[in-house]
A protein has these predicted regions:
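A conserved catalytic-core segment of Leloir-type glycosyltransferases
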Residues: 44-147, 156
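Short N-terminal targeting/anchoring amphipathic segment
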Residues: 95-103, 110, 153-174, 187-190
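Short acidic, glycine/proline-rich loop/turn micro-motifs
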Residues: 160, 200-202
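Terminal low-complexity segments of carbohydrate-biosynthetic enzymes
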Residues: 3, 9, 136, 150-160
Length: 202
């Protein structure tokens, strides 16, 4: 009997986060298993405090699926805390807000958005957020997570037999992982567009 082939899955939405996007990936890797493929899933590492965190959803992951969880970084928090340290202030703990992915809320660590009150710091914060979201965190807020996920994926490709790469979008930053692996390894890359890249899906 031949050895099962291995699919490396890059999925921002996966149990135990309760999102619509998780269902497709869970069912997909289950169906592949029945056709002789095993899957390694690289996904977000939840903190357990997210409003859509549901540990009971772990039961959806079928036996034999290997899950590697990568923490999500928040660029706004990192910049804000760096400035506070320079000013001698105590860095704030990240708050939890929801980033919209494929019509569902994916809870991530993020600063609470508030309207500038007119102070210098408020205006600086608002400007920083605008610059990041307009020119840096493109195509979405998961760009830093994708960079970390790529490091993990490269290590897996170097140490394990990987036969193909599958990225499911959104978050659209997952695409960068698939594109880089395709370029560096020559592995087949499947990009699953669940939603529009741009515009309101509704």
């Amino acid at each position: 009997m031949s050895e099962p082939r291995t699919l490396l899955v890059i999925a921002g939405e996966f149990p135990p986060l309760k999102t619509i996007g998780r269902i497709r990936t869970v069912k997909f890797v289950d169906q592949l298993r029945q056709h002789g493929w095993r899957s390694i899933v690289i996904t977000l590492k939840p903190s357990g405090t997210e409003p859509n965190y549901d540990p009971s959803l772990m039961a959806e992951i079928v036996d034999g699926v290997e899950v590697v969880r990568v923490p999500i970084r928040n660029r706004e928090d990192e910049i804000a805390n760096a400035v506070k340290r320079l000013l001698g202030r105590k860095p704030a703990a990240p708050s939890v807000s929801a980033a919209t992915v494929s019509g569902a809320a994916v809870a991530v660590a993020a600063p609470v958005a508030t309207a500038p009150s007119g102070g210098l710091m408020d205006h600086a914060h608002a400007m920083t957020r605008w610059v990041l979201r307009s020119f840096v965190d493109v195509p979405d807020d998961f760009r830093l997570w994708a960079d970390e996920a790529l490091k993990v994926a490269r290590k897996l490709c170097a140490e394990r037999r990987i036969d193909a790469v599958y990225t499911t979008l959104p978050p659209f930053s997952s695409m960068f992982v698939g594109h880089a692996l395709r370029r560096e390894t020559g592995l087949p890359w499947i990009a699953d567009y669940r939603d529009l890249w741009y515009g309101d899906v509704l």
